[in-house]
């Protein structure tokens, strides 16, 4: 996240209406939403590195897990951008989603049920108590790189449509 830094014209930037985890991308000439009180600016992650998905190559890649050497350099600035450092992967039951989720439910199982569309299991897993914004930290920290917020939004829309 750029803060107290001059915006360089040569750098390609992404403007986000709202915060980094739950905001929407807007154009540079866009506007701040009615319910938002901040505009986030990140460097665009168009610079793909050879074997960028290997965690030990670059120690400037931010990670909340000790899969890269970036945790050794806590005081040094990290290079935050929009690059995913890999592509979407399969769900792996490591417990990382449960560690960062703010509620006491099973987020991975709920996401899977939203993908399947099983309303009864979605209700048992607590779909009525969540909103897509609750899954923002999962989108950032999950090694599966699955868009959990989008899946939950589609699950809630499906639930609303089927119960009407």
Which positions does each model-derived feature cover?
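Redox cofactor-anchoring modules in respiratory/redox and cofactor-processing assemblies
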Residues: 1-164
């Amino acid at each position: 996240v750029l803060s107290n830094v001059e915006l360089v014209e040569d750098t390609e930037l992404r403007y986000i209406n709202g915060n980094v985890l739950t905001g929407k991308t807007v154009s540079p000439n866009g506007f701040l939403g009615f319910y938002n009180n901040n505009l986030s600016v990140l460097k665009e992650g168009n610079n793909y590195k050879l074997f960028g998905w290997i965690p030990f190559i670059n120690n400037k890649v931010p990670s909340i897990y000790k899969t890269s050497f970036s945790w050794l350099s806590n005081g040094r600035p990290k290079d935050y951008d929009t690059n995913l450092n890999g592509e979407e992967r399969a769900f792996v039951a490591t417990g990382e989603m449960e560690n960062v989720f703010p509620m006491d439910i099973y987020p991975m199982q709920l996401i899977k049920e939203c993908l399947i569309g099983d309303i009864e299991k979605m209700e048992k897993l607590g779909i009525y108590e969540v909103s897509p914004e609750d899954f923002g930290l999962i989108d950032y920290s999950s090694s599966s790189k699955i868009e959990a917020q989008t899946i939950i939004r589609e699950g809630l829309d499906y639930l609303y449509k089927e119960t009407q």
